[in-house]
Amino acid sequence: MAEKKRYSKRYCKYTEAKIEFIDYKDVEMLKHSLSERYKIMPRRLTGNSKRWQERVEVAIKRARHMALIPYIIDRKKVVENPFKI
């Protein structure tokens, strides 16, 4: 039987930094919760608390709707920075 992966304990960076609001226009801050294909990363990888993970998801979805962040990128078209295409 395959062993489960053990993830290291991560702490919510938003709680530690005492941030009160996540702005959807701050793309640099939102990139920490996105994978290289711009998919939203789960809580177990980012270490966000439930409260902040929900707020990050809403901010990312708003930024996608406003075309500040791309939706999902194809495997063939993965580049380092899609904003400079």
Curated annotation (Swiss-Prot):
Q: Hey, which family's this protein in?
A: Belongs to the bacterial ribosomal protein bS18 family.
Alphabetically, the GO molecular function entries are:
small ribosomal subunit rRNA binding; structural constituent of ribosome
- Look up and give the organism this protein is from: Wolinella succinogenes (strain ATCC 29543 / DSM 1740 / CCUG 13145 / JCM 31913 / LMG 7466 / NCTC 11488 / FDC 602W) (Vibrio succinogenes)
Q: How does this chain assemble?
A: Part of the 30S ribosomal subunit. Forms a tight heterodimer with protein bS6.
Which InterPro entries does the UniProt entry name for this protein? Ribosomal_bS18, Ribosomal_bS18_CS, Ribosomal_bS18_sf
Q: Which GO terms describe its cellular component?
A: cytosolic small ribosomal subunit
Keyword Disulfide bond set for record: no
User: What biological-process GO terms show up in the record?
Assistant: translation
* Full protein name: Small ribosomal subunit protein bS18
Q: Which gene encodes it?
A: rpsR
The free-text function statement in the UniProt record for this protein reads: Binds as a heterodimer with protein bS6 to the central domain of the 16S rRNA, where it helps stabilize the platform of the 30S subunit.
Any one Pfam family here would be Ribosomal_S18
In terms of NCBIfam families, this protein maps to: S18 (TIGR00165)
Sorted UniProt keywords: Ribonucleoprotein, Ribosomal protein, RNA-binding, rRNA-binding
What SUPFAM superfamilies does the database record attribute to this sequence? Ribosomal protein S18
* Plastid recorded as keyword: no
